[in-house]
Amino acid sequence: MLEPPNHQTTAKTDQAASMSIQLLLFVDERPSSHEYIQPIRDYIKTVSQDCPCQLEVIEIHEQPHLVEHFRLVATPALVKVVPEPRQTLAGSNLVNQLKKWWPKWLSSLEENHHDSLLEKSSNVGYSGELMRLSDEIFRLKKDKENLQEQLKFKDQVLAMLAHDLRSPLTAASIAVETLELAKNQDPTEKQQKLTAQLFNQTRNQFRVMNRLITDILQASKSMNAQLQVHQTEVFLPRLSKEIVEQYNDLLTEKSLKLIQDVPQDVPGVYADEELIRQVIVNLIDNAIKYTSEGGEITLSILHRTSQKVQVSVCDTGPGIPEEKQERIFEGHFRLQRDQGKEGYGLGLSLCRKIIRVHYGQIWVDSVPGQGSCFHFTLPVYR
């Protein structure tokens, strides 16, 4: 014989389900990141008698869209999605932070429980079907943004081909024609110096074109597919030394001095070495391009915090106006002072993509007439 449902028991069950703290723990592939999972689970187990808690562990390489959705800047990170408002905890002491905030979250959950049914239903947040719908809407928005970026990128490439690539090609062509006219003349000392200068100019222009083509190809690859990131422990002092050595001839040619402030005890970073090499090369290329003969360039590396290492490339060039300092990272944005040069091109836009995929930051400090300093951060390998 079937017994009638116990409405009181059902109500209690529904009440318990609604009064549940929901947490998302974001971790990366580093062993040190996974070490936080069990201590957090152990603490939640000890306090779950007071209130049920739902903990979901998310591998950031499997769901990168959620990392961007919650605007995370470091891992591991613990995100409280219910009760509202959303809150993010990050750092090396997640368990202590959780102990501090748990009583406040319980209090907030109890207050929300006594609100209207409509308000409570809105606080269900990111569970079940609503979570899936939210993710789907977010993905569709990202797809739309990616398509718009690709269309914009095509316009940028056309603009680059029309101006940036044509300018060095014209200069190299003029130099070659001048050499051809001078080849049948008697080689005087003055003509020999001129010939050497023309060869040097031609070589520099070909170098500019090669860099532009490399930027276009790499940027095109990153626009049409996700950057392939293979993160390992990278030692920046060794990497920076390798990069600087390849600039010796160019620095001598422009009478530039490159100062390195790179402590050898800087901890390793968690990064893709080739992508970070590309960022540093791009920043040094720009510094050399905008620094006049006899100027100075500084490459420095600083262990900024226990979790971050900062790399800086500074020059004594003309500087960048404050209102333009953010826009130079927006693809093919051209400063007024770039009209006589090949411009920043797509390089800085690509640098920002690379640093963001490493959960770092990139920015510029500059005063017109006093040079520029480009900085970026990377997570310490643990």
UniProtKB/Swiss-Prot annotation:
Q: Which SUPFAM superfamilies match?
A: ATPase domain of HSP90 chaperone/DNA topoisomerase II/histidine kinase, Homodimeric domain of signal transducing histidine kinase, Thioredoxin-like
Give start and end of each Histidine kinase domain: 160-382
As its record notes, the protein acts as a catalyst of: ATP + protein L-histidine = ADP + protein N-phospho-L-histidine
Its Enzyme Commission number(s) read 2.7.13.3
A single GO molecular-function term is: phosphorelay sensor kinase activity
Q: What does the domain comment read?
A: The N-terminus interacts with KaiC, while the C-terminal histidine kinase domain autophosphorylates and is probably responsible for self-oligomerization. The N-terminal domain stimulates the C-terminus to autophosphorylate.
- Report the function annotation for this chain: Member of the two-component regulatory system SasA/RpaA involved in genome-wide circadian gene expression. One of several clock output pathways. Participates in the Kai clock protein complex, the main circadian regulator in cyanobacteria, via its interaction with KaiC. KaiC enhances the autophosphorylation activity of SasA, which then transfers its phosphate group to RpaA to activate it. In addition to its output function, recruits fold-shifted KaiB (KaiB(fs)) to KaiC to cooperatively form the KaiB(6):KaiC(6) complex (independent of SasA kinase activity).
Report quaternary structure and partners: Homooligomerizes. Interacts with KaiC. Participates in the KaiABC clock complex, whose core is composed of a KaiC homohexamer, 6 KaiB and up to 6 KaiA dimers. SasA and KaiB(fs) compete to bind to KaiC.
Protein's UniProt name: Adaptive-response sensory kinase SasA
Name the source organism: Crocosphaera subtropica (strain ATCC 51142 / BH68) (Cyanothece sp. (strain ATCC 51142))
